[in-house]
Curated annotation (Swiss-Prot):
This is Acyclotide phyb-K. Contains 3 disulfide bonds. The lineage of its organism: Eukaryota, Viridiplantae, Streptophyta, Embryophyta, Tracheophyta. Residues 1-24 form the signal peptide. Keywords: Disulfide bond, Knottin, Plant defense, Signal. Disulfide bonds join 47-64, 51-66, 56-71. InterPro entries: Cyclotide, Cyclotide_sf. Belongs to the cyclotide family. Bracelet subfamily. Probably participates in a plant defense mechanism. Expressed in midvein, lamina and periphery of leaves (at protein level). The presence of a 'disulfide through disulfide knot' structurally defines this protein as a knottin. Residues 25-43 form a propeptide. Pfam families: Cyclotide.
Length: 74
């Protein structure tokens, strides 16, 4: 029983550290991604799908391609 409680306590502690790290100290994030439209070209249309980890899969059928981590249609 003591082992279960210690594992549960360790898991809660890890979750607490991650919560504090992601919400209270944003400079420590592993990967900061800027998905704003400021970096998009003005002649392109946003397709509504990010391509941070996986390239444009669904919207590729519409002719969208990845540009600055956002799927856009030229």
């Amino acid at each position: 029983m003591a082992r279960v409680n210690s594992l549960k306590c360790a898991l809660c502690f890890i979750v607490l550290i991650l919560f504090v790290q992601l919400n209270c100290i944003p400079e420590t994030r592993v990967m900061a991604v800027e998905l704003s439209r400021v970096f998009l070209q003005t002649s392109s249309t946003d397709c509504g799908e990010p391509c941070v980890y996986i390239p444009c899969t669904i919207t590729a059928l519409l002719g969208c391609s990845c540009l600055n981590k956002v799927c856009v249609r030229p």
